[in-house]
Amino acid sequence: MWLIAGLGNPGLQYQNNRHNIGFMVIDAIYQSFSFSPWSKKFQAEISNGLIDGEKTFLIKPQTFMNLSGQAIGEVLRFYKLDLKNFIVICDELDLPPGKVRVKTAGGNNGHNGIKSIDAHCGTDYCRVRLGIGHPGSKELVHQHVLGNFTKSDQEWLSPLLDAIAKNIALLIKGDRCLFMDTISQATKNKNLQ
């Protein structure tokens, strides 16, 4: 059994923010597979289905980004899931737009959602970090992450979301290198800034 969590902030005013790319990926996965209707429990929106024959829960914490670990911790404990079967998808300022990095464990790199998960759940889980680019100045970070993706961002964002959804089974199978290579190939001809 697997848990895939996308990080973001709840509410219509945040749905197109760069910070919500994790929620966007979860929605793309949800649309690509047969998942149950969303239900609200564990301070989250949660759905379950099968990905490549593996029972999988999708979760979008509704606690706001900085408290994501509360909701995720509840789900992990309730279903008695091991961290090795947990994948979190989040935005990453320090990667160029559309770039993907996958790793297990490590630091939070200043990401408050990851910091919350680490505090509530531990650190030994798979992190899929999706580049949203850095605005260049620390003073502009808050405005950048809470800013909406632009029309030109859709040139790389839509293919990225689609490629991740179609290839998420590779991560569940444990083939991180092939996952990253496949995503890179699917988005390499897109206009990344």
From Swiss-Prot:
<dbReference type="GO" id="GO:0005737">
    <property type="term" value="C:cytoplasm"/>
</dbReference>
<feature type="site" description="Stabilizes the basic form of H active site to accept a proton">
    <location>
        <position position="91"/>
    </location>
</feature>
<dbReference type="InterPro" id="IPR001328">
    <property type="entry name" value="Pept_tRNA_hydro"/>
</dbReference>
<feature type="binding site">
    <location>
        <position position="112"/>
    </location>
    <ligand>
        <name>tRNA</name>
    </ligand>
</feature>
<feature type="binding site">
    <location>
        <position position="14"/>
    </location>
    <ligand>
        <name>tRNA</name>
    </ligand>
</feature>
<keyword id="KW-0820">tRNA-binding</keyword>
<feature type="binding site">
    <location>
        <position position="64"/>
    </location>
    <ligand>
        <name>tRNA</name>
    </ligand>
</feature>
<dbReference type="GO" id="GO:0006515">
    <property type="term" value="P:protein quality control for misfolded or incompletely synthesized proteins"/>
</dbReference>
<dbReference type="Pfam" id="PF01195">
    <property type="entry name" value="Pept_tRNA_hydro"/>
</dbReference>
<comment type="similarity">
    <text>Belongs to the PTH family.</text>
</comment>
<dbReference type="GO" id="GO:0072344">
    <property type="term" value="P:rescue of stalled ribosome"/>
</dbReference>
<keyword id="KW-0378">Hydrolase</keyword>
<dbReference type="InterPro" id="IPR018171">
    <property type="entry name" value="Pept_tRNA_hydro_CS"/>
</dbReference>
<dbReference type="GO" id="GO:0004045">
    <property type="term" value="F:peptidyl-tRNA hydrolase activity"/>
</dbReference>
<feature type="site" description="Discriminates between blocked and unblocked aminoacyl-tRNA">
    <location>
        <position position="9"/>
    </location>
</feature>
<comment type="subunit">
    <text>Monomer.</text>
</comment>
<feature type="active site" description="Proton acceptor">
    <location>
        <position position="19"/>
    </location>
</feature>
<keyword id="KW-0963">Cytoplasm</keyword>
<dbReference type="GO" id="GO:0000049">
    <property type="term" value="F:tRNA binding"/>
</dbReference>
<comment type="function">
    <text>Hydrolyzes ribosome-free peptidyl-tRNAs (with 1 or more amino acids incorporated), which drop off the ribosome during protein synthesis, or as a result of ribosome stalling.</text>
</comment>
<protein>
    <recommendedName>
        <fullName>Peptidyl-tRNA hydrolase</fullName>
        <ecNumber>3.1.1.29</ecNumber>
    </recommendedName>
</protein>
<dbReference type="InterPro" id="IPR036416">
    <property type="entry name" value="Pept_tRNA_hydro_sf"/>
</dbReference>
<keyword id="KW-0694">RNA-binding</keyword>
<feature type="binding site">
    <location>
        <position position="66"/>
    </location>
    <ligand>
        <name>tRNA</name>
    </ligand>
</feature>
<comment type="function">
    <text>Catalyzes the release of premature peptidyl moieties from peptidyl-tRNA molecules trapped in stalled 50S ribosomal subunits, and thus maintains levels of free tRNAs and 50S ribosomes.</text>
</comment>
